[in-house]
């Protein structure tokens, strides 16, 4: 929530997460062959109490939009605040502006995630730095009783494939390269909307590079994970 008089300290970026297994979720042959411009997908974002899902951080907000046949489906959005059952750490409030008061009396993840699961149905899931968001969903499988086995595309990895000359694949940098204006930054729904516009703006350049179907996109994503894991070792 940037407002005048706010300190001009840039927010630190979320660390990049890579999860090889995420891109092993192979849709069937028919699913692989679906052209990206006809793909039914749900583009989503989470806000969280911190950056360490395995160390007890929790989801406090989910926002999602539906994309069908290369268009954002207006009026088909999902937006929920979630009570994390813990105090929201001050440093994370700088990111998302969500306070303990905002989540007081809101449902917990065990209630919200089944609703989100129904919203997603069998659509492909699209997110920026998707392994981060997916890790939170995965760690809640036991309490929520739902798991997300949908194919997943990561905007960060697709950006790394398209703009391999660039170092910065943050949401802001990717949007700027594609000429997309960002609004509603750091609200889950605002970010999901931006991510949907970025994803759609990528379809032309991806097709120019031979990435036309869901299967093609999953293949280049896997290659990017491999590449980035190798680079991280040096």
Label each residue range with its predicted role.
Residues 2-33, 196, 200-234:
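Acidic two-metal-ion nuclease catalytic site recognized across multiple nuclease folds
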Residues 158, 174, 194, 198-201:
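Generic recognition of well-ordered alpha-helical segments
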Residues 21-138, 142-150, 164-168, 172, ...:
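Conserved non-catalytic scaffold segment of RNase H-like nuclease domains
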Residues 191:
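Conserved catalytic/binding loops enriched for acidic/polar residues
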């Amino acid at each position: 929530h940037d407002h005048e008089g706010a300190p001009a300290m840039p927010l630190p970026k979320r660390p990049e997460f890579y999860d090889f297994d995420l891109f092993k979720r192979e849709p069937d042959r028919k699913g692989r062959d679906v052209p990206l411009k006809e793909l039914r997908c749900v583009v989503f974002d989470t806000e969280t109490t911190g950056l360490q899902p395995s160390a007890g951080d929790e989801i406090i907000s989910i926002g999602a939009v539906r994309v069908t046949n290369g268009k954002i489906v207006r009026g088909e959005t999902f937006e929920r605040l979630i009570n994390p059952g813990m105090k929201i750490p001050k440093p994370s409030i700088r990111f998302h502006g969500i306070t303990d008061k905002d989540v007081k009396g809101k449902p917990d993840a065990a209630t919200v995630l089944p609703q989100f699961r129904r919203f997603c149905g069998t659509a492909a899931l699209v997110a920026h730095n998707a392994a981060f968001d997916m890790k939170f969903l995965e760690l809640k499988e036991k309490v929520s009783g739902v798991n997300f086995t949908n194919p997943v595309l990561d905007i960060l990895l697709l950006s790394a494939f398209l703009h391999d000359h660039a170092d910065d694949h943050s949401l802001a940098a990717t949007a700027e390269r594609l000429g997309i204006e960002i609004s509603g930054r750091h609200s889950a729904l605002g970010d999901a909307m931006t991510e949907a516009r970025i994803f759609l703006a990528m379809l032309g350049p991806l097709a120019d590079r031979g990435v036309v179907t869901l299967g093609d996109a999953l293949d280049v994503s896997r290659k990017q994970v491999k590449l980035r894991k190798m680079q991280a070792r040096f």
